[in-house]
Amino acid sequence: MSYRKLGWDSSQRKAMLREMTTQLIINERIVTTEARAKEVRRTAEKMITLGKRGDLAARRKAAAFVRNEIADIHEEGDEVVVKSALQKLFSDVAPRYKDRNGGYTRIMKLAVPRKGDAAPMVVLELV
Protein backbone atom coordinates (compact mmCIF):
# COMPACT_ATOMS: atom_id res chain seq x y z
CA MET A 1 0.00 0.00 0.00
CA SER A 2 1.57 3.28 -1.05
CA TYR A 3 0.87 6.55 0.71
CA ARG A 4 2.70 9.54 2.10
CA LYS A 5 3.67 9.43 5.76
CA LEU A 6 3.59 13.24 6.08
CA GLY A 7 5.88 13.04 9.11
CA TRP A 8 3.22 11.61 11.45
CA ASP A 9 2.28 8.24 12.84
CA SER A 10 -0.75 6.46 11.42
CA SER A 11 -3.39 7.69 13.89
CA GLN A 12 -2.36 11.35 13.53
CA ARG A 13 -2.21 11.02 9.74
CA LYS A 14 -5.67 9.43 9.59
CA ALA A 15 -7.13 12.12 11.86
CA MET A 16 -5.63 14.88 9.69
CA LEU A 17 -6.98 13.27 6.50
CA ARG A 18 -10.46 12.90 8.03
CA GLU A 19 -10.50 16.51 9.19
CA MET A 20 -9.23 17.96 5.91
CA THR A 21 -11.62 15.82 3.84
CA THR A 22 -14.53 16.99 6.00
CA GLN A 23 -13.46 20.62 5.63
CA LEU A 24 -13.19 20.18 1.85
CA ILE A 25 -16.76 18.84 1.75
CA ILE A 26 -18.06 21.70 3.91
CA ASN A 27 -16.13 24.62 2.38
CA GLU A 28 -15.51 23.09 -1.08
CA ARG A 29 -12.03 24.66 -1.02
CA ILE A 30 -8.99 24.47 1.28
CA VAL A 31 -5.43 25.84 1.23
CA THR A 32 -2.74 23.38 2.30
CA THR A 33 0.66 22.00 1.36
CA GLU A 34 1.09 20.10 -1.88
CA ALA A 35 1.84 16.73 -0.24
CA ARG A 36 -1.20 16.93 2.04
CA ALA A 37 -3.43 18.02 -0.83
CA LYS A 38 -2.44 15.01 -2.91
CA GLU A 39 -3.35 12.66 -0.05
CA VAL A 40 -6.60 14.47 0.79
CA ARG A 41 -7.56 14.32 -2.89
CA ARG A 42 -7.47 10.50 -2.76
CA THR A 43 -9.81 10.30 0.23
CA ALA A 44 -12.13 13.05 -1.01
CA GLU A 45 -12.57 11.32 -4.36
CA LYS A 46 -13.45 8.07 -2.57
CA MET A 47 -16.02 9.85 -0.38
CA ILE A 48 -17.67 11.53 -3.38
CA THR A 49 -17.82 8.18 -5.18
CA LEU A 50 -19.55 6.72 -2.11
CA GLY A 51 -21.93 9.68 -2.19
CA LYS A 52 -22.77 8.95 -5.81
CA ARG A 53 -23.63 5.34 -4.94
CA GLY A 54 -25.97 6.53 -2.21
CA ASP A 55 -26.98 3.14 -0.81
CA LEU A 56 -27.01 2.26 2.88
CA ALA A 57 -23.59 0.58 2.83
CA ALA A 58 -22.05 3.62 1.15
CA ARG A 59 -23.64 5.95 3.72
CA ARG A 60 -22.28 3.87 6.59
CA LYS A 61 -18.80 3.71 5.07
CA ALA A 62 -18.76 7.48 4.51
CA ALA A 63 -20.14 8.11 8.02
CA ALA A 64 -17.23 6.13 9.46
CA PHE A 65 -14.75 8.51 7.79
CA VAL A 66 -16.37 11.95 7.51
CA ARG A 67 -16.54 13.83 10.81
CA ASN A 68 -19.95 14.74 12.23
CA GLU A 69 -19.66 18.51 11.81
CA ILE A 70 -22.24 21.16 10.99
CA ALA A 71 -22.02 22.21 7.34
CA ASP A 72 -24.94 24.64 7.08
CA ILE A 73 -27.57 26.30 9.27
CA HIS A 74 -30.54 28.15 7.80
CA GLU A 75 -34.14 28.97 8.62
CA GLU A 76 -37.17 27.60 6.80
CA GLY A 77 -40.20 29.40 8.14
CA ASP A 78 -40.18 29.00 11.91
CA GLU A 79 -37.77 26.06 11.92
CA VAL A 80 -33.98 26.11 12.02
CA VAL A 81 -32.51 23.49 9.66
CA VAL A 82 -29.07 22.10 10.47
CA LYS A 83 -27.20 20.15 7.77
CA SER A 84 -24.19 17.97 8.64
CA ALA A 85 -21.16 17.38 6.44
CA LEU A 86 -22.42 13.88 5.64
CA GLN A 87 -25.83 15.20 4.56
CA LYS A 88 -24.12 17.82 2.39
CA LEU A 89 -21.97 15.11 0.79
CA PHE A 90 -24.97 12.96 -0.18
CA SER A 91 -27.50 15.71 -1.01
CA ASP A 92 -25.41 18.54 -2.53
CA VAL A 93 -21.90 17.47 -3.52
CA ALA A 94 -22.35 13.94 -4.94
CA PRO A 95 -25.36 14.69 -7.23
CA ARG A 96 -23.27 17.40 -8.91
CA TYR A 97 -20.92 14.71 -10.23
CA LYS A 98 -23.43 12.02 -11.24
CA ASP A 99 -22.26 12.11 -14.90
CA ARG A 100 -18.55 12.43 -14.08
CA ASN A 101 -16.27 9.40 -13.65
CA GLY A 102 -13.66 10.62 -11.18
CA GLY A 103 -11.63 13.80 -11.20
CA TYR A 104 -13.88 15.66 -8.78
CA THR A 105 -11.09 17.81 -7.33
CA ARG A 106 -8.56 20.30 -8.69
CA ILE A 107 -5.16 21.27 -7.27
CA MET A 108 -3.88 24.74 -8.17
CA LYS A 109 -0.40 25.79 -7.05
CA LEU A 110 -0.02 29.11 -5.27
CA ALA A 111 2.79 31.46 -6.29
CA VAL A 112 4.05 32.14 -2.77
CA PRO A 113 5.42 29.30 -0.60
CA ARG A 114 4.55 29.09 3.09
CA LYS A 115 6.44 31.54 5.24
CA GLY A 116 8.68 29.80 7.73
CA ASP A 117 9.60 26.60 5.93
CA ALA A 118 8.98 27.53 2.27
CA ALA A 119 6.66 24.55 1.76
CA PRO A 120 4.86 24.69 -1.60
CA MET A 121 1.24 25.70 -1.00
CA VAL A 122 -1.77 24.76 -3.12
CA VAL A 123 -5.52 25.29 -3.26
CA LEU A 124 -7.51 22.05 -3.28
CA GLU A 125 -11.07 22.58 -4.48
CA LEU A 126 -14.03 20.69 -5.83
CA VAL A 127 -14.44 21.11 -9.59
UniProtKB/Swiss-Prot annotation:
It comes from the Bacteria. GO terms for molecular function: structural constituent of ribosome. One of its GO terms (cellular component) is cytosolic large ribosomal subunit. Pfam families: Ribosomal_L17. One of its GO terms (biological process) is translation. Keywords: Ribonucleoprotein, Ribosomal protein. HAMAP family: Ribosomal_bL17. Part of the 50S ribosomal subunit. Contacts protein L32. Belongs to the bacterial ribosomal protein bL17 family. This is Large ribosomal subunit protein bL17. It comes from Lactobacillus delbrueckii subsp. bulgaricus (strain ATCC 11842 / DSM 20081 / BCRC 10696 / JCM 1002 / NBRC 13953 / NCIMB 11778 / NCTC 12712 / WDCM 00102 / Lb 14).
